[in-house]
Swiss-Prot record:
A motif (Effector region) lies at residues 41-49. This is Ras-related protein RABA5b. One of its GO terms (cellular component) is plasma membrane. GTP binds at residues 19-26, 67-71, 125-128, 155-156. Pfam families: Ras. One of its GO terms (biological process) is protein transport. The lineage of its organism: Eukaryota, Viridiplantae, Streptophyta, Embryophyta, Tracheophyta. The gene is RABA5B. SMART domains: RAB, RAN, RAS, RHO. Gene3D superfamilies: P-loop containing nucleotide triphosphate hydrolases. Keywords: Cell membrane, GTP-binding, Lipoprotein, Membrane, Nucleotide-binding, Prenylation, Protein transport, Transport.
Amino acid sequence: MGKEDDRGEEYLFKIVLIGDSAVGKSNLLSRFSRDEFDTNSKATIGVEFQTQLVEIEGKEVKAQIWDTAGQERFRAVTSAYYRGAFGALIVYDITRGDTFESVKRWLQELNTHCDTAVAQMLVGNKCDLEDIRAVSVEEGKALAEEEGLFFMETSALDATNVDKAFEIVIREIFNNVSRKLLNSDAYKAELSVNRVSLVNNQDGSESSWRNPSCCSR
């Protein structure tokens, strides 16, 4: 206490993980937030979230990442789950084609319930299971380009691209918010009410993060 905060901004961004059951959403979250992988992970019941600190351009950003059950019987939480989200990772399992086919339905639900523009990343998880792959990298990339999403394949098991996927979404949110705050007091007020506390209006944008077809493995 008593220490003067010279950073000027304080950010808290809500990010949601969506996708069918058993695609690895919970393990992606635990790998990113705690660097852990649970081989006996059970289906999520209801909603869970973790908060992770990330530093961007000298500013402390708190990402509040929400994980929810993918089963249809839990869809009653939909509106509250999406409300106030700044970003979303839409996750499918590269070994299960049906989870990839569900992506457009998840995108429709996301766009229906979110109350603001959302930074979106399509994530093909379990890329360590190359021998039983059912969805090609090219298919994932093509869908991401069609829908205007970032794209990345990940493995929660061996941590491939997990940090990178989350960090791209967080940085994209940061850049979007910074640009809008530069010229909009109304937007600043909206964010303060919804889910972000901001003190100053400084632009921290980096256009190099805005590749809508980012794909790495």
